[in-house]
Design a protein with these regions (language model features):
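Serine-hydrolase catalytic machinery in alpha/beta-hydrolase-like enzymes
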Residues: 7-100, 114
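Short, hydrophobic/aromatic-rich segments at coil-to-beta transitions
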Residues: 1-7
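Primarily recognizes the serine-hydrolase "nucleophile elbow" in alpha/beta-hydrolase
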Residues: 84-153
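Conserved small/polar residues in nucleotide/adenosyl-binding loops
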Residues: 158
Length: 159
């Protein structure tokens, strides 16, 4: 199994780092977005990618621009969605013959599902969520989940 660094072009002026992990006999690929407080190399993200690899699933983890810049304030949705789309496009290039899925942890899951709800992510067959922030702590509401009705691919939550 290899873990290779990749560069993902988000737009004309911005790139982000990624980690492409592929087992020898991969049968699928998951684009995996990190949560708001920890980047792609966080122990949860690494453990998830390692666990998926032992089961034959390649992963492309990536940084959102704010995390790449060392900021604690998450990107606004338009930039986060563009980053997810760019990561998906990169995964298509890296694994052209594998079924593709997208998802993430918490903030990454929400940004991926919002991007999919706005316009289908190319070649993505389903979404995988490792936790999904339905509302901020101690502020129950459903605004963050309303877009899920617009997601037209299968989705699975892992809690």
């Amino acid at each position: 199994m290899t873990v290779d660094p990749v560069t993902i072009r988000v737009d004309e002026t911005r790139t982000v780092s990624g980690l492409f992990q592929v087992p020898e006999r991969a049968f699928a690929c998951l684009v995996l977005a990190h949560g708001a407080g920890a980047g792609m190399a966080h122990r949860f993200m690494t453990a998830a990618a390692d666990g998926l690899a032992t089961r034959g699933v390649a992963t492309l983890r990536f940084q959102f621009p704010y995390m790449e810049a060392g900021s604690k304030r998450p990107d606004r949705p338009p930039l986060a969605h563009a980053t997810v789309r760019s990561a998906v496009t990169t995964a298509i290039r890296l694994t052209p013959n594998l079924p593709l899925f997208a998802g993430g942890k918490s903030f990454g899951a929400r940004m991926t599902s919002q991007a999919q709800a706005e316009a289908p992510l190319p070649d993505v067959r389903g979404l995988v969520f490792f936790g999904f922030p339905l509302h901020p702590a101690n502020k129950p509401a459903d605004e963050r989940a309303r877009h899920l009705a617009e997601v037209k691919v299968d989705r699975k939550s892992v809690v």
